């Protein structure tokens, strides 16, 4: 499975999360996953909620449209984005 997969109602992303980064950003490919740096610490679900908020802004969807399918407690996650309104250029380059 590739880092970004299209499905009938959106996109499925395989992510590697770097918590406690200096800024929020989509870094690029990390092996067969997309690396995302976020500023939140990995404590009490703060990183997950910050990740859904960050992805919501990037794809212009509500936080409820972002589902963490796998990896709730780890750095390796599989996230589904339902009906994205826009696709960031870093992700669009990986779908081709």
Curated annotation (Swiss-Prot):
It comes from the Bacteria. One of its GO terms (cellular component) is cytoplasm. InterPro entries: DUF167, YggU-like_sf. SMART domains: DUF167. Transmembrane segments: none annotated. Belongs to the UPF0235 family. This is UPF0235 protein YggU. It comes from Salmonella typhimurium (strain LT2 / SGSC1412 / ATCC 700720).
